[in-house]
């Protein structure tokens, strides 16, 4: 379906939605300041009504949801039996329905899996994109839109990142966290409200920002995302996603054993790093670009952006063995550029359990 934002002056769109309106850096600044709203055409909405919805989602996912209060935002992961991330979603409940906001590329697979896992429980997950869209911004910015209220409660998800949620665990050891000042929320709106937003922007009554601005602010906050930062091997530990998407003290769910083992007894095999890229040529690496130490490839870029204050930045996943002070380079279309590494997940992440060490008896002593 054609975007309602396509006719706006300067609008640049692709299949994911509105990328920008001609000034991505200005849009970033205004979005961060609470002066702009971003249409999130790359998101999808899944509705999960039914009396058993929260206990059912709790049993299937990494998050504790049974006692989730209406209007409180959290996020969940669906893991495979080996603990790898398969799906991710933001979730807010209105007292009658759990509303999942997902990356559009993940929505079909997540919905199919949820429908397969219903059994005889009182749940009925369905795609809700025909009825609803998603817009994002600071909490104050979203006061300019009218969220959907199907059960009388506004459908607004407030991003918990980077605070460590109950039952979570943060690996990034920096203080303050670069996302500490990030104020981000997403509102589910009706399609009529989406059209009103577009009309208000065309009339100059509302300022919009595109997805390019949204992603740059996300990368600067070290915030992982399914579309860009998850591959078939991704563990939540590697992305510091344990802080908001995993509850370590809840009941059993698929993949929990691996989550607990890596966190308590081992180390994640890879780790997320933030990169400050050489900005002399303003060339950004593409998704999947090689990260190197010397000539050896030690990881890949997952997200890259041109930030309005920090310049060219990126997130990358590298081997755990890469030294925290290693000199890194990144492949680009114009050649190799240097990259200064900032540690997000340290090499010693995990192994949090205090395992008692028993004195070892010699063979002679044990034989006596």
Q: Where in the sequence are the language-model features?
A:
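Short amphipathic beta-strand starts and helix->beta connectors
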Residues: 24-33, 72-88, 118-121, 162-175, ...
């Amino acid at each position: 379906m054609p975007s309602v934002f396509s006719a706006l002056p300067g609008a640049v769109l692709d299949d994911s939605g509105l990328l920008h309106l001609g000034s991505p850096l200005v849009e970033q600044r205004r979005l961060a300041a609470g002066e702009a709203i971003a249409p999130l055409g790359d998101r999808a909405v899944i509705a999960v009504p039914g009396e058993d919805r929260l206990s059912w989602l709790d049993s299937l996912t990494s998050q504790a949801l049974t006692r989730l209060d209406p209007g409180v935002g959290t996020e969940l992961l669906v893991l495979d039996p080996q603990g790898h991330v398969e799906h991710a979603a933001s979730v807010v409940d209105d007292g009658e329905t759990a509303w999942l906001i997902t990356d559009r590329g993940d929505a079909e697979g997540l919905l199919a899996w949820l429908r397969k896992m219903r059994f005889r429980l009182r749940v009925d997950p369905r795609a809700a994109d025909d009825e609803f869209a998603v817009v994002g911004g600071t909490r104050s910015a979203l006061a300019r839109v009218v969220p959907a209220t199907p059960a009388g409660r506004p459908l607004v998800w407030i991003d918990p990142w980077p605070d460590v949620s109950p039952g979570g665990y943060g690996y990034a050891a920096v203080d303050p966290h670069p996302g500490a000042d990030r104020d981000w929320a997403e509102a589910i709106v009706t399609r009529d409200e989406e059209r009103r937003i577009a009309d208000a922007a065309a009339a100059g009554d509302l300022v919009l920002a595109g997805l390019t601005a949204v992603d740059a602010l996300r990368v600067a906050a070290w915030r992982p995302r399914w579309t860009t930062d998850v591959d078939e091997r991704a563990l939540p530990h590697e992305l510091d996603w344990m802080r908001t998407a995993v509850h370590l003290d809840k009941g059993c769910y698929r993949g929990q054993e691996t989550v607990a083992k890596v966190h308590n007894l081992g180390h994640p095999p890879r780790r997320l790093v933030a990169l400050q890229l050489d900005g002399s040529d303003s060339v950004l690496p593409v998704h999947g670009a090689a990260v190197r130490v010397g000539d050896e490839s030690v990881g890949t870029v997952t997200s890259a952006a041109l930030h309005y204050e920090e310049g060219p930045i990126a997130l990358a996943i590298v081997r755990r063995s890469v030294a925290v002070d290693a000199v890194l380079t990144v492949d680009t279309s114009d050649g190799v550029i240097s990259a200064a590494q900032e540690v997000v997940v340290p090499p010693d992440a995990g192994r949090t359990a205090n395992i008692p060490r028993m004195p070892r008896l010699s063979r002679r002593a044990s034989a006596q």
